Structure formats: C-alpha cells, structure tokens
Design a protein with these regions (language model features):
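Catalytic-core "active-site belt" of small-molecule-metabolizing enzymes
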Residues: 1-94, 99, 108, 135, ...
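A conserved acidic, glycine/proline-rich C-terminal tail/linker
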Residues: 98-127
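Short glycine/threonine-rich loop-to-helix capping motif typified by GTGT followed
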Residues: 127-137
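Short, charged beta-turn/beta-strand-edge "cap" motif at the junction between a beta-strand
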Residues: 125-128, 142-145
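Short strand-turn-strand beta-turns centered on an Asx-Gly dipeptide
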Residues: 78-79, 121, 141
Length: 152
C-alpha cells in the first residue's frame, strides 16, 4: 500500500452470472441469469493521481437469496468503528438495475454477459481512506460479510 496514491475502500454487491444474456429482452429479467450475489470489498487506488483502479477485491461467500437485494443495507467498519453505510436502493432503485444496465450495454456492444462472469454494483457508500494496518469489515444485510487487512 505504501506506493499507492490515496488508497480507499468501497462496498459493492457482486453478481455471478449463471446463464448467457443473449438479448435485450433477457437482460431485463435479472432473476433469469443471476446465479448468486455476494458482498465485495474493493480497494481502489493508483500509483499516481492520474491513474486509479481496483488494487484488490475481497469476495464474501455467495448467496442465492436474490430477494434481499432491493433492501440490502451495508455498513463498513474500519478498525472496529462504523465509518460508512449505505443501502442498495440508493443506487438508482435496486442493485439489480445496475446489472440490467451492464447486460444491455454488453449486448449493444455484441459482447454478451456469459456464464461465470462477475458484475459489481456501484459502491454502496462513499469511499473511505485506507492506511497500512487498517482492518476493514463490511456487512451487507442478507448477503453476509467480508474482511480485509491493509498491509504495507
């Protein structure tokens, strides 16, 4: 982490695609192609101010409880204290709206989502600064939790 510029942590929901999304109509029904959902912690940063991207992604255990997604609440703890919170519905309706948009864009680009692809929602809260030694845990109601420890 020492060489990274402004590393930060975000909570996302990840979706495992279980079936190819071959047309726009199928893209509109995420229950037909989402095999599982899971909590994700994403460490974002770069080597300079102009370069930024995913540095690490930690994935929690998958759940097939797709019905919890609309009301998914997330809390992010840093070193045992809540530092951010958000809900799935705050990301323009349900988190499923994000995967529908991605599926439609991929179809328009003739690069359909396929079985085994993983799609992340947008962050469920503002990104939080990370320092070496920090321990982060995110809990997503109905989906579970995942932890990371930042090292030098």
């Amino acid at each position: 982490m020492g060489a990274l510029t402004a590393p930060r942590v975000e909570t996302h929901i990840g979706f495992l695609v279980g079936a190819a999304v071959v047309d726009r109509e199928k893209a509109s029904v995420p229950a037909d192609y989402i095999a599982a959902a899971f909590p994700v912690l994403r460490l974002v940063g770069g080597r300079s101010e102009s370069e930024s991207g995913s540095i690490a992604i930690a994935v929690g255990a998958p759940s097939i409880r797709r019905n919890v997604l609309r009301d998914s609440l997330a809390t992010l703890n840093r070193n045992g204290r809540v530092v951010a919170a958000g809900e799935g519905a705050s990301m323009r309706q349900s988190p499923c709206a994000g995967i529908v948009a991605v599926a439609r864009m991929r179809n328009a680009a003739e690069s359909a989502l396929r079985r085994g692809h993983i799609v992340l929602t947008g962050s469920m809260h503002s990104s939080v600064a990370a320092q070496p030694g920090d321990h982060f845990r995110t809990d997503v109601l109905g989906l579970g939790s995942v932890c990371i420890r930042c090292v030098e």
